[in-house]
């Protein structure tokens, strides 16, 4: 039984280059170091929607963010692992045995971050995965609902297309599962470990949803315009925000056995 974590980096950041199970992923010209994976260009089927609006490949990758790593893993699924994990830039999941799982967030300087990824942590992770189908960071309790929180800052068009995509593409999710968006608890930041077969299903559904949005939205790469009634300064970042909400929905709708562990924020 083996596991591998694939952090997504868009800027250089130190990490444990001797870890056997952490393989940082990067695109473009970011230099990460040894034991990392450079994601070659494999995005033509998705980039076509951006290209039609004159968006450069560089801007596409900036908009895509961590989804580039998830897409790469979906298309190049490693056969040597049973559990697949993804984390976003400067964030990690805590598997240090000496740190209680009920901790919320741990701020860690770079001098400590380079020590993460030990064999002892891997053993702890695999032990957790024997009893759970997914691991995420600890959930956030919102003042309002998941839906309200999103719509307070983001353009609404992509949110409603997200809902419609779930209903049109995946009828096995009944209407009651959509009530999760009215709840107030969500594992923000899209950091997780899945059993491999569940990762493949999660990623496959996510990219079907994104493509549905691309095919039906008014603009694939929106920019902030005078008079827009949302506060988000970079609305083209919606793929990551949709992915963040879909993770929580996917876990809840499929009634997965979940363990929450502390989030490590790398300073």
Residues covered by each model-derived region:
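ER/Golgi luminal nucleotide-sugar-dependent glycosyltransferases, focusing on the catalytic module
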Residues: 1-267
